[in-house]
Amino acid sequence: GTSPKGLARDVLEAVIGALTDVQPAALSASEVADAVGTSRVTARRYLQYLADEGRVARAQRLGGSGRPEVTFAWRR
């Protein structure tokens, strides 16, 4: 298939790889960004796309700072 508009296929595959490597655990956008070597904003755009496609499950992780962090987990 073709990669979605504005998303690079290699980055998309790296994001998917980061999530499948840790499944069933979930990662935050910043953790995915670190794993892939992109900015958090970029990682979030790819994660959002995968969530919209139903390939990734979104959840919230309660952080120590009190503000919940959105996490993403690969849906098998």
Set out the residue ranges of the language-model regions.
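Short alpha-helical segments that sit at the start of domains
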Residues: 1-17
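Flexible loop/N-cap segments at domain edges
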Residues: 24-76
